[in-house]
Amino acid sequence: MEEEVRLMKGNEAIAHAAIRYGADGYFGYPITPQSEVLETLAELRPWETTGMTVLQAESEVAAINMVYGGAATGRAAMTSSSSPGVSLKQEGISYLAASELPALIVNVMRGGPGLGTIQPSQADYFQATKGGGHGDYHLIVLAPATVQEMTDFVGLGFDLAFKYRTPSMILADGVVGQMMEKVVLPPQRPRRTDEQIRQQCPWACLLYT
């Protein structure tokens, strides 16, 4: 796929950008206001084009642990959720940080506390920037103000996560996730081969044949 100009929602842009980055896997669970990420990936069917795995897990806890397993093999794995769903993922995120594994987490925030509302919110700032889960760690946090930044931060988030071997988060809110803007989608990048992963990620748990 070449560079392309489209009109789309921020959540849809996340899905398109993940495919075009060459992501290996997305594992998620529906929750308003970010469900379009998973819905768009299901519609685009990247497993038939790039070989990207897309799976709706049985829960948020299962989804983040699937990301954990993918990240341990050096794959570009990601998930997305919204505020209470991200809270359920915190133990898995903490384990990713402890294991020094790269991963991308997208939080399209909604109001809280508790189950909260489906209205947009920016209330998860401290949870995201101060670590969230137990232990002494900090995420790399990218906060988009536009749909274009939602797109650009997918590649940047993955690149920073692999550079520093730590999870990174795109911290958006329901407004950016739902509003539509013109977006310049980047050209398609190929997924890395096993040999490239072995060279670039010597820490990865890959089978040697």
Describe the predicted segments one by one:
Residues 42-44, 94-97, 155-160, 185-188:
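Short, solvent-exposed amphipathic alpha-helical segments in soluble enzyme
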Residues 165-207:
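Conformationally flexible catalytic loops at phosphate/diphosphate-handling active centers
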